[in-house]
């Protein structure tokens, strides 16, 4: 594809794309450059003044341009590793920016209340207390933003085959990871404060999810193989073996979500001792569907819903136990990164989708639940976070070295 044709696809970044092609800069280098701009934006966002936010806005715009240019350059390559590398860098960029937005409140250089020229008018509105009071409330919003950032690409993977994922409506209109959400969020921070920035991020993220889901109900859409995207661990696979795929995945998952959602809404802090494990036990019902082929029209919902339940449980346990909020942020981010890495490798035939080393969604929930019930969360939480990020780094560097088609799901090959 010529530079002119590539640039015509995305006119705002056309000059950057042409320059990158002329200088033979690959998409991976553009993605790594975007991470540098993300770190710059995060650092300046944490400092808090209007001038600092202005610098962060410039960095966020540069981040948007480099991510978008890298994505356009990546259209020339059909290699799954390139696609995952672009997605991973974009996800990490969002994590850095969200952490920087919340870190300023922890460092007391940024107010948790609405600020800026528009923020004064928002005091006394729902935005002023959105997410909860004080520093913990802001970090809660950051964690929710991470959940949305991880779920948007997962929904795209579950709905579309590789050729159609990049052109899904949600990414065309509202931007994929690392795209338009970040500069818009920084503008909101500059005008109305950190909470307003997260509100904008969440609104755009939810809009992208809704648009992508609406795209799935168009005539001619057919389900794709999503069993390997669930992120099951050994325990889930073992439980699913007993029913051998005869139980549809949505029914037991719905029961688990109902119990988990109800208890989370009531507050895990109010559950004494071993009752903290009740949401985990309820979600284990979803394991009965781990061997099912997931060929139903609604079965694509199963992986995102399982992962959303895991994220909510990990976050709520951390906040209920008053763990250090950045640690809760890091653990949820590690779990989200893990799920996406496994899903991309499963789609490429480089992994079965069974998360043996990462414990799986159910293993992580069990470990955190037991730690919360026994009072050991202060040790387990950081240990699990460090382990997952080490595993993510290891698998990102060596997990893509296998041969395509080398891994199968146990339900397929026994």
Regions inferred by a protein language model and the residue ranges of each:
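Membrane interfacial helix-start motif at the N-side
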Residues: 18-25
